[in-house]
């Protein structure tokens, strides 16, 4: 019976040792879970912050693109109006030169005809 008692005591000791090892492994696993949950929370906060920042950047970008489009439209309209002014100025200059030439010819003709009659 003492042998059986000794064997039972050995089994009991081994069982206790195995249970303690399992408890230690469980505690280590709990620490790892806690660390990973903290890391997960940290990453979720970073993602939330980055998402908010991305939304702000997108809003700013949309406003700036709209402003750039307004600049493009204004520049295009101004350039078109300026080209019309240039064309009108060129036409006006041509008409003015032609009329000035006609007036010069008319004045020269009048001077010739009045100069010839008086002589």
UniProtKB/Swiss-Prot annotation:
Residues 13-70 form a coiled coil. The lineage of its organism: Eukaryota, Metazoa, Chordata, Craniata, Vertebrata. GO terms for biological process: axon arborization; axon extension; axonogenesis; cell division; intraciliary transport; microtubule cytoskeleton organization; microtubule nucleation; receptor clustering. One of its GO terms (molecular function) is identical protein binding. Self-associates to form fibrils. Also forms dimers as well as monomers. Interacts with SPAST. GO terms for cellular component: axon; axoneme; centriole; centrosome; ciliary basal body; midbody; motile cilium; nucleus. It comes from Bos taurus. This is Microtubule nucleation factor SSNA1. Its main location: nucleus. Keywords: Acetylation, Cell cycle, Cell division, Cell projection, Cilium, Coiled coil, Cytoplasm, Cytoskeleton, Flagellum, Neurogenesis, Nucleus. The keyword Coiled coil applies. Microtubule-binding protein which stabilizes dynamic microtubules by slowing growth and shrinkage at both plus and minus ends and serves as a sensor of microtubule damage, protecting microtubules from the microtubule-severing enzyme SPAST. Induces microtubule branching which is mediated by the formation of long SSNA1 fibrils which guide microtubule protofilaments to split apart from the mother microtubule and form daughter microtubules. Plays a role in axon outgrowth and branching. Required for cell division. The gene is SSNA1. Belongs to the SSNA1 family. The modification N-acetylthreonine is found at residue 2. It is found in: Nucleus; Cytoplasm, Cytoskeleton, Microtubule organizing center, Centrosome; Cytoplasm, Cytoskeleton, Microtubule organizing center, Centrosome, Centriole; Midbody.
């Amino acid at each position: 019976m003492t042998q059986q008692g000794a064997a039972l005591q050995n089994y009991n000791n081994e069982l206790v040792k195995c249970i303690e090892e399992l408890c230690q492994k469980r505690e280590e696993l709990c620490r790892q879970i806690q660390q990973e949950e903290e890391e997960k929370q940290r990453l979720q906060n970073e993602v939330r912050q980055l998402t908010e920042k991305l939304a702000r950047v997108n809003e700013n970008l949309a406003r700036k693109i709209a402003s750039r489009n307004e600049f493009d439209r204004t520049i295009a309209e101004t350039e078109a109006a300026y080209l019309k002014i240039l064309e009108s100025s060129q036409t006006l200059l041509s008409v003015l030169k032609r009329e000035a030439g006609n007036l010069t010819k008319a004045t020269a003709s009048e001077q010739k005809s009045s100069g010839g009659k008086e002589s």
